């Protein structure tokens, strides 16, 4: 595990907002296994958590990682939440995206994690990953995710979502699928090589 620069562990925590106290998918070992792996990594350990929207972040997990387990943690939100609902103000669309971006940046000040975004625009609810990919060019999204991985250089990537229809929202499914895309070519991705 000390040669983890090119090795990345992929975990799927499951539904957003409840990673620390929730049941992990079978075979992952959940947060306890993650803590054990981080301990083996020594002083330099980086964990990237990926979700689709600002409100998908698992703040409890980010705090545990950065403040409790001594890891450098980051959250990659595929969107800025422009397509979400706003029950407390008139802002919608890009205005709401600005508010939600600022909320995430303020949360990172508190939990000690870094914040990243892709260029994907939250166009509202979608029923499937295929529907989401009609609005988000797959190559552009992949490039953005790869750029974040190359900059942050995580040893562990945690997905808030599984990448399956069980995630419900199509954008959530895409966030889970982005993890699967990086499993095989990750050594090349981190080196800056490969076709990605």
Which sequence ranges carry the predicted segments?
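Bacterial N-terminal signal peptides
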Residues: 4-16
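Active-site rim/loop-helix segments in enzyme catalytic domains that contact anionic ligands
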Residues: 21-151, 173-184, 188
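Short acidic, glycine-rich surface-loop motifs adjacent to enzyme active sites
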Residues: 152-165
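Glycine/threonine-rich flexible loop motifs
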Residues: 164-173
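Active-site cores that bind ATP or allylic diphosphates and position pyrophosphate for catalysis
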Residues: 188-196
């Amino acid at each position: 595990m000390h040669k983890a620069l090119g090795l990345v562990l992929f975990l799927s925590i499951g539904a957003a907002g409840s990673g620390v106290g929730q049941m992990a998918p079978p075979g992952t070992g959940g947060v306890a296994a993650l803590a054990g792996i981080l301990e083996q990594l020594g002083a330099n350990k980086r964990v990237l958590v990926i979700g689709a929207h600002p409100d998908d972040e698992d703040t409890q997990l980010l705090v545990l990682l950065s403040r409790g387990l001594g890891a450098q943690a980051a959250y990659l939100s595929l969107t800025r939440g422009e397509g979400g609902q706003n029950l407390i103000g008139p802002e919608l669309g890009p205005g709401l995206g600005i508010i939600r971006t600022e909320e995430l940046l303020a949360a990172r000040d508190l939990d000690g994690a870094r914040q990243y975004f892709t260029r994907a625009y939250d166009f509202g609810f979608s029923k499937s990953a295929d529907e989401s990919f009609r609005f988000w060019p797959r190559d552009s999204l992949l490039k953005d995710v790869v750029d974040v991985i190359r900059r942050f250089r995580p040893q562990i990537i945690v997905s808030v979502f599984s990448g399956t229809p069980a995630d419900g929202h199509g954008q959530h499914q895409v966030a889970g699928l982005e993890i699967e895309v990086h499993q095989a070519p990750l050594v090349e991705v981190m080196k800056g090589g490969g076709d990605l």
